[in-house]
C-alpha cells in the first residue's frame, strides 16, 4: 500500500511539474520574467521525484541500501541539493513578491529575465554549497557495521546544524518575515481603499481638472445634469440683467460673477478661451450666444477656480458644475480605465501572494518535523533521541 501511494505521488509530481514548465514556456500570458522561478522550482521537484524518492522508497522497503556505496554518497548529496534548492526557491519567490509589492515602479523596471536568471543561479549555488561538504570532507566515519549496508545522512553535529539552518530554518524565517511585511502593506492599502475609490489618483486629478469631490460615476450623472441646468439658468439670468460683460476673458482680474478674493481662471495655454460646456448639435444650431456657458458667469467653487484648464481629449465633453470641471465620454473612460488597470494589477499581485503564502505554509509544515528531529539528534543525541520510525 505504501509503495502504491508513493508511486502515485512520484507520477503526480512529475506530471504536474511538467505541465507547469510547459505552460510557462508555451503560453504568452505566462512569459513574465518572474515565472522563471516557477520553471526552476518545477525542475528541482521533478529531479527529486525521479532521482531521490525511488531510491528512498527502495531503501525503506528493503531495510538496507541495495545499491553501491559510491551511489549512496552521490544520492545523499543530490538529496540535500534538490531539497535545499526547492526551499530556497520559495524564499526567492517570496522576496520577489515583496519587492514587487513594496517597490512596484522601481523593481518592475529592474525585473528583467537576466536579473531573474542571476537570482536562480544564486539559489542553486547556495544549495550546492550546503550539499557538497559531505562529498569533500567525509570525516571520521568509524567502523562500518557488519551485515546489511546502510545509507544514512551525515551524523556530525556541525554539519547537521549548519545544513539545517541553511536549508530550512533561515529560509523559513525569511519567508515568514517577508509575508508578514506583505500582509501589513496589503492591510494598509486596504485601509486607504475607501478614499482611493472616492477620488482619482494624482495623474487623474490633472486630467479631470482636480474636481473637488473626484470624477463622478454614471450613477451621479442625473444630479450632475440638474446642477448644470441650474448653472445655465443662472447664466441666462445674469445676461438678461446685464451682469455679464462682453469681451472679457478668463484671465481678466475683474471677471464679473467671481468674487475678487478668488484667483482668476488660467488660460488654456493656446491663447484661446476654453469652452467649459459644449452643447449638443441641435442646441448649437440655435443662438450661439445663449448656448455658450462662459466660465466667469458660472458660480464655481474656489477649488475649481484655482484648477488648471482641462486638456480635452478628442471626442470628449467637458461639463462645468458647481463641483468643478468634469470630463465625460472618452475622457473619463481613459482616466478611469488607467486607474482600474492599476487596481486590477494590484489585485492580481495580492491574489498571487496569497496563493504562494498558502503553498509555502503547507510546504513548511511538511518539512518542519524532519528538520526539527534531525537537528534535535545533533543537539542532544543521548536524551533527545527520536525513534527511528517517527524519524
Curated annotation (Swiss-Prot):
Extracellular side: 63-72, 141-156, 380-388
Transmembrane segments: 1-25, 37-62, 73-95, 118-140, 157-180, 356-379, 389-391
GO biological processes: platelet activation; regulation of smooth muscle contraction; regulation of vasoconstriction
GO annotation, cellular component aspect: cell surface; plasma membrane
Residue ranges with Pro residues bias: 256-266
SUPFAM superfamilies per UniProt: Family A G protein-coupled receptor-like
Region of interest (Disordered), ranges: 194-218, 233-312
Signal among keywords: no
Keywords associated with the record: Cell membrane, Disulfide bond, G-protein coupled receptor, Lipoprotein, Membrane, Palmitate, Receptor, Transducer, Transmembrane, Transmembrane helix
Membrane topology: Multi-pass membrane protein
InterPro entries: ADR_fam, ADRA2B_rcpt, GPCR_Rhodpsn, GPCR_Rhodpsn_7TM
Cytoplasmic topology ranges: 26-36, 96-117, 181-355
Gene3D superfamilies associated with the record: Rhodopsin 7-helix transmembrane proteins (1.20.1070.10)
GO molecular function, one term: epinephrine binding
Domain of life: Eukaryota
Record-annotated disulphide pairs: 72-151
Feature: compositional bias, Acidic residues: 282-294
Positions of the record's site feature: Implicated in ligand binding: 79
Biased composition regions of type Basic and acidic residues, renumbered to the chain: 233-247, 271-281
PANTHER family, per database record: ADRENERGIC RECEPTOR-RELATED G-PROTEIN COUPLED RECEPTOR, ALPHA-2B ADRENERGIC RECEPTOR
Role noted for this protein: Alpha-2 adrenergic receptors mediate the catecholamine-induced inhibition of adenylate cyclase through the action of G proteins.
Protein name: Alpha-2B adrenergic receptor
Phylogenetic lineage: Eukaryota, Metazoa, Chordata, Craniata, Vertebrata
Name of the coding gene: ADRA2B
Amino acid at each position: 500500500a505504501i509503495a502504491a501511494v508513493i508511486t502515485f505521488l512520484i507520477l503526480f509530481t512529475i506530471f504536474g511539474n511538467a505541465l507547469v514548465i510547459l505552460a510557462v514556456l508555451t503560453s504568452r500570458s505566462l512569459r513574465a520574467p518572474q515565472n522563471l522561478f516557477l520553471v526552476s522550482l518545477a525542475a528541482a521537484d521533478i529531479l527529486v521525484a525521479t532521482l531521490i524518492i525511488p531510491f528512498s522508497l527502495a531503501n525503506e522497503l528493503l531495510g538496507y541500501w541495495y545499491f553501491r556505496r559510491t551511489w549512496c554518497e552521490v544520492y545523499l548529496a543530490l538529496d540535500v541539493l534538490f531539497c535545499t534548492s526547492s526551499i530556497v526557491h520559495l524564499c526567492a519567490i517570496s522576496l520577489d513578491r515583496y519587492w514587487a509589492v513594496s517597490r512596484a515602479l522601481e523593481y518592475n523596471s529592474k525585473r528583467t529575465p537576466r536579473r531573474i536568471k542571476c537570482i536562480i543561479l544564486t539559489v542553486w549555488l547556495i544549495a550546492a554549497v550546503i550539499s557538497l561538504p559531505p562529498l569533500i570532507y567525509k570525516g571520521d566515519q568509524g567502523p562500518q557495521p557488519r551485515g546489511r549496508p546502510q545509507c544514512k545522512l551525515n551524523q556530525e553535529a556541525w554539519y547537521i546544524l549548519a545544513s539545517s539552518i541553511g536549508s530550512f530554518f533561515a529560509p523559513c524565517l525569511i519567508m515568514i518575515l517577508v509575508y508578514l511585511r506583505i500582509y501589513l502593506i496589503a492591510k494598509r492599502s486596504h485601509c486607504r481603499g475607501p478614499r482611493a475609490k472616492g477620488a482619482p489618483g494624482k495623474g487623474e486629478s490633472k486630467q479631470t481638472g482636480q474636481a473637488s469631490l473626484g470624477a463622478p460615476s454614471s450613477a451621479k450623472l442625473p444630479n450632475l445634469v440638474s446642477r448644470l441646468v441650474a448653472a445655465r439658468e443662472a447664466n441666462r439670468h445674469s445676461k438678461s440683467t446685464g451682469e455679464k460683460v462682453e469681451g472679457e476673458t478668463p484671465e481678466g482680474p475683474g471677471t464679473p460673477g467671481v468674487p475678487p478674493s478668488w484667483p482668476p481662471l488660467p488660460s488654456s495655454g493656446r491663447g484661446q478661451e476654453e469652452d467649459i460646456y459644449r452643447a449638443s448639435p441641435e442646441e448649437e444650431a440655435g443662438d450661439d450666444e445663449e448656448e455658450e456657458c462662459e466660465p466667469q458667469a458660472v458660480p464655481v467653487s474656489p477649488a475649481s477656480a484655482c484648477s488648471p484648464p482641462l486638456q480635452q481629449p478628442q471626442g470628449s465633453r467637458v461639463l462645468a458644475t458647481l463641483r468643478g470641471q468634469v470630463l465625460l465620454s472618452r475622457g473619463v473612460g481613459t482616466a478611469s480605465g488607467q486607474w482600474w488597470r492599476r487596481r486590477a494589477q494590484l489585485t492580481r499581485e495580492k491574489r498571487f501572494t496569497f496563493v504562494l503564502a498558502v503553498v509555502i505554509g503547507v510546504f513548511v509544515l511538511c518539512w518542519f518535523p524532519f528538520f526539527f528531529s534531525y537537528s534535535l539528534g545533533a543537539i542532544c543525541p543521548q536524551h533527545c533521541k527520536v525513534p527511528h520510525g517517527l524519524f
